[in-house]
């Protein structure tokens, strides 16, 4: 089982310098998993970018205002693509690790941002030792190995 991080899914949906590697990861024959933390990040980052492109929002407050006024209906097709990617590839949705000690320890021990610590602790809870990511911060986590994205 390989845990898939936000930046891999994002790079499948949006052209980035990692898109070819991300496609290779998604097409691997391995079982893939992710979590609500990753999907929340993916939806947020994707909609924030789309809102800027479509409505000229330049900051978080403007983004929130646009969503409050327009709702999610202007993004229905985009959201269908995001959620469809997970469903179509049969990426397993894992429950997050709600053990606060695990989360706090991952933050403190590896100097991870809160969401990255949540992802690492979720991998720990589910005994997942491989992560597909373009985030070098996960290289510091001793129970995770970052898979070689060039394969």
Model-inferred region functions:
Residues 28-29, 89, 141:
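Structured helix-beta-strand junction loops
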Residues 3-5, 11, 95-96, 112-114, ...:
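Histidine- and aromatic-rich ligand-binding microenvironments
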Residues 8-9, 38, 118-119, 137-138:
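Alpha-helix capping/helix-boundary segments
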Residues 80-129:
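Active-site neighborhoods of divalent-metal-dependent phosphate/nucleic-acid chemistry enzymes
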Residues 17, 21, 34-37, 95-98, ...:
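Alpha-helix N-cap and coil->helix boundary residues
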Residues 19, 39, 43-101:
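Active-site-proximal, substrate-binding regions of enzyme catalytic domains
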Residues 1-38, 44-61:
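Short, well-structured N-terminal submotif of metal-dependent ribonuclease cores
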Residues 1, 120-151:
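Acidic, PIN/NYN-like endoribonuclease modules and their adjacent C-terminal/linker elements
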């Amino acid at each position: 089982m390989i845990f898939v991080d936000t930046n891999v899914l994002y790079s499948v949906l949006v052209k980035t310098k990692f898109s070819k590697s991300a496609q290779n990861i998604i097409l691997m024959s391995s079982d893939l998993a992710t979590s609500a933390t990753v999907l929340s990040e993916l939806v947020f980052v994707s909609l924030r970018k789309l809102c800027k492109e479509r409505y000229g929002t330049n900051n978080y407050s403007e983004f929130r205002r646009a969503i409050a006024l327009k709702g999610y209906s202007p993004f229905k097709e985009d959201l269908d693509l995001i959620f469809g990617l997970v469903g179509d590839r049969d990426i397993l949705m894992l429950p997050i690790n709600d053990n606060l000690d695990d989360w706090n320890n991952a933050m403190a021990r590896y100097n991870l941002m809160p969401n990255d610590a949540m992802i690492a602790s979720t991998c720990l809870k589910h005994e997942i030792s491989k992560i597909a990511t373009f985030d070098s911060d996960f290289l510091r986590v001793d129970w995770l190995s970052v898979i070689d994205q060039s394969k």
